[in-house]
A protein has these predicted regions:
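Short amphipathic alpha-helical segments
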Residues: 15, 64, 118, 240-241
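A short glycine-rich, aromatic-capped structural motif
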Residues: 11-74, 92-95, 171-172
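Short, structured beta-strand segments at or near domain termini in extracellular proteins/domains
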Residues: 233-241
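Functional-site microenvironments in short loops/helix caps that host divalent-cation chemistry
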Residues: 21, 27, 31-32, 74-224, ...
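N-terminal amphipathic/basic-hydrophobic helices that include classical n-h-c signal peptides
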Residues: 1-12
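Residue-level detector of intrinsically disordered, flexible termini
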Residues: 4-6, 220-221, 239
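Generic low-complexity, intrinsically disordered sequence content enriched
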Residues: 5-7, 67, 108
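A general structural signal for alpha-helical elements within enzymatic catalytic domains
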Residues: 9, 64, 102-105
Length: 241
């Protein structure tokens, strides 16, 4: 069974605000944790990455149009802290995020997918030697930090971009699923060209900080991973093409 809208449903325009990330060579990893080393050279091709994390209103449309498949909403879906339509969609598993990408690809004709870890880090650093997507200053330096992310995420466009390409919330708000299987020692064997992670594993990779940790794991090189079926309220995703 495909992922087409339900019979009789109104076809509504689905648009993603894409940012073109230029291809090139960069130095990946090199942070304080063992799984971020060794620092190594990576070459990625140009790709597009969404300006924002997938929002609740976007994910709700996916749920509505694929309800015949019986995919449940994330367990936190109706809690007030996550209910604003411009909040990031919180709680999708990696499997849910991949299904969303397949649905959006069919809906729009664009080949939508999750970014690789290498692509995410390329977008975050953007030809700069910086600790965080917004620069070298720690998260505590961000505007109004004392009052943000205490009870949950914030709308994806609540604050102006601090990134040179214009990304919103990159490294903030929710952990973002990546396409790769995760291995702590992958950097020891990673190919130079367009690395896509190991061939198998038990956990899928994610990048960026989250509201639950007051975004303190937001470094560009920081890696995290959980099993692909889990649904956590500080996990979301951003699509690539």
């Amino acid at each position: 069974m495909g992922l087409s809208p339900r019979a009789g449903g109104m076809l509504q325009e689905m648009t993603t605000e894409w940012i073109e990330v230029p291809g090139g060579v960069f130095r990946m990893g090199g942070g304080p944790r063992d799984n971020e080393n060794p620092r190594h050279e990576v070459r990625v091709r140009s790709f597009r990455l969404a300006r924002t994390q997938v929002t609740r209103e976007e994910y709700q449309r996916f749920l509505d149009e694929t309800s015949i498949l019986g995919r449940p909403a994330p367990p936190f879906w109706h809690e007030p802290a996550y209910a604003h339509p411009r909040m990031p969609a919180v709680g999708p598993s990696w499997e849910d995020a991949v299904a969303y990408c397949a649905w959006l690809s069919e809906r729009t004709g664009d080949p939508v997918r999750l970014p690789t870890e290498a692509e995410w880090e390329r977008a975050a650093t953007c030809d700069r030697e910086v600790l965080y997507p917004w620069g070298d200053d720690p998260p505590e330096s961000l505007p109004d930090y004392e009052r943000r992310w205490r009870e949950g995420p914030e709308p994806v466009d609540a604050w102006p971009s601090l990134h040179p390409l214009g990304f919103l919330g990159l490294g903030e708000n929710v952990h973002e699923w990546c396409s790769d299987w995760y291995a702590a020692d992958y950097y020891r064997v990673s190919p130079v060209d367009d690395p896509r992670g190991p061939d198998s594993g038990t956990r899928r990779s994610s990048r960026g900080g989250s509201w639950r940790h007051e975004i303190k794991v937001s470094r560009c090189a920081a890696r995290s991973a959980i099993p692909p079926h889990l649904r956590y309220a500080d996990y979301g995703f951003r699509v690539a093409s």
